[in-house]
């Protein structure tokens, strides 16, 4: 009996120990599962295992500006190319050796200015030959007329036949015809001599010379001597969508002529002010646009042929428009858009249509309302419905002033 009771007591102790171990294991498992994952911060959201949600993300600092209303002229705008009002390739009209160039590359020349000289000696010889033939035939005509007068007096006394009189009269007529031809030859020889001195056909700026002195040139040369481009005045050729044509025609009917402004490629600086010159007579079916030409005096030479500019046509004066900073407007696959800040300081992407640029602002045609706030800085971090913190723009030099005050 004592052996059996000992075995029972030992088995009971083992069972109790096993139960205790199981309880300790359960407690340890609960503690391990409740512990935060390795590397987690001590924020309440992460300790509870909750994922970041609405209202729990950190606000993104941005700068914003309100959409404002202003009185401004209304424009139609398009991309244009500056073109010379006249372009002339100066070519020689006669063949010969180029003796002298009288212009500098890039120089402004006037109509009639001497540009080049060709060796004149062959043309002088031709002129002298023509003048000699004219003098000879003039003398022959004078002699034939005197003979005709004598024949006429003798014919009255029947001392010469009628045939001889008619022959002498025909000789006078023939010599007169020779004189007409001789005078034409003299004029032609003089013209060829004049052509040996090449003059500017009109006002313009001389380009790079196409041939050097000493070369033999001819009237068949396609490159010519130099190209002259008239830049005073100068034109800008641009296009407008066919949807803008009704506004353009209405403005022409009311104003007669329209003010045109040429701006640089960045659309930040006005280069020149001119007027609408002409419209094409048909719409380009391939692009759905109408070609338009504007003219500028260009006395300061700020416009240059083949330069790309932004062209604006003023179609109305002092119209109420909405303006936003140009820095707020972004371009994506869906077109132009801005980030609009709502009353809860959350941002939303908004597509919009813009018009002409006015300095650092853009005219808004559609997409936002007056008073709405649009993000102007900090845009690269924004996503739809992100929470933002609008901060004031730092005054230029403020950081440097702050560092100076902190230095001992």
From Swiss-Prot:
Residues 1-28 form the signal peptide. GO terms for cellular component: efflux pump complex; plasma membrane. HAMAP family: MdtA. It comes from the Bacteria. Keywords: Cell inner membrane, Cell membrane, Membrane, Signal, Transport. The gene is mdtA. It is found in: Cell inner membrane. Coiled coil: none annotated. It comes from Edwardsiella ictaluri (strain 93-146). This is Multidrug resistance protein MdtA. The lineage of its organism: Bacteria, Pseudomonadati, Pseudomonadota, Gammaproteobacteria, Enterobacterales. Residues 35-50 have a biased composition (Low complexity). Its main location: membrane. Part of a tripartite efflux system composed of MdtA, MdtB and MdtC. It is a peripheral membrane protein. GO terms for molecular function: efflux transmembrane transporter activity. InterPro entries: CusB_D23 (IPR032317), Multidrug-R_MdtA (IPR022824), RND_pump_MFP (IPR006143). SUPFAM superfamilies: HlyD-like secretion proteins. Belongs to the membrane fusion protein (MFP) (TC 8.A.1) family. Residues 35-55 are annotated as: Disordered. Pfam families: HlyD_D23.
